Curated annotation (Swiss-Prot):
Gene Ontology MF terms in the entry: metal ion binding; threonine-type endopeptidase activity
Record's protein name: ATP-dependent protease subunit HslV
Activity regulation remarks: Allosterically activated by HslU binding.
Task of the protein: Protease subunit of a proteasome-like degradation complex believed to be a general protein degrading machinery.
HAMAP family registered for this protein in UniProt: HslV (MF_00248)
Source lineage: Bacteria, Pseudomonadati, Pseudomonadota, Gammaproteobacteria, Legionellales
Organism: Coxiella burnetii (strain Dugway 5J108-111)
Length: 181
């Protein structure tokens, strides 16, 4: 069976805000199956925002697992991410899941992979998915050359990615939190 694929998720931290945004397109092969999927969500009573790229069902399973890790570790984002990554890598069922997660709270931003990696990005910027490199390049240029807010940077960079990547559309979901950095 052909895999659902493609998306763009982007996170930017700037001026006391952290923002994660993503597009809404779900593709299967060369067919758009859905244009308004919600790939960015609030977790842990709204204190954490998360986005996913990869298989939709896989991502929902990982969101549930991650939220239970947040509950278990009293909202400690890094600890919950490391515990999820360990489970994801070692559990026979979980390790078959194909997705990447971006997660952020007021203090940290992380990418979690099925290989057991928990990556803290440089320069307050992270992007995943088929259009991630386009969005990241656009956001980096906007961060370095404008005074735009984190939200505006995410909106503009996702728009640029959607203009380039065939697996990304302009139906965005954007979530924002106050940040300590």
């Amino acid at each position: 069976m052909e895999q659902f694929r493609g998306t763009t998720i982007l996170s930017v931290r700037r001026n006391g805000k952290v923002v994660i945004g993503g597009d809404g397109q779900v593709s299967m092969g060369s067919t758009i199956m859905k244009a308004n999927a919600r790939k960015v969500r609030r977790l842990y009573n709204g204190k954490v925002i998360a986005g996913f790229a990869g298989g939709t069902a896989d991502a929902f399973t990982l969101f549930e697992r991650f939220e239970s890790k947040l509950e278990k570790h009293s909202g400690n984002l890094t600890r919950a991410a490391v515990e999820l990554a360990k489970d994801w890598r070692t559990d026979r069922i979980l390790r078959r899941l194909e997705a990447l997660l971006t997660v952020a709270d007021s203090k940290a931003s992380l990418i979690i992979t099925g290989l057991g990696d928990v990556i803290e990005p440089e320069q307050s910027l992270m992007a995943i998915g088929s259009g991630g490199s386009f969005a990241q390049a656009a956001a980096k240029a906007l961060l370095e050359n404008t005074k735009l807010s984190a939200r505006k940077i995410v909106e503009k960079a996702l728009t640029i990615a959607a203009d380039i990547c065939i697996y990304t559309n302009q139906n965005f979901t954007i979530e924002e939190l106050d940040s300590e950095s």
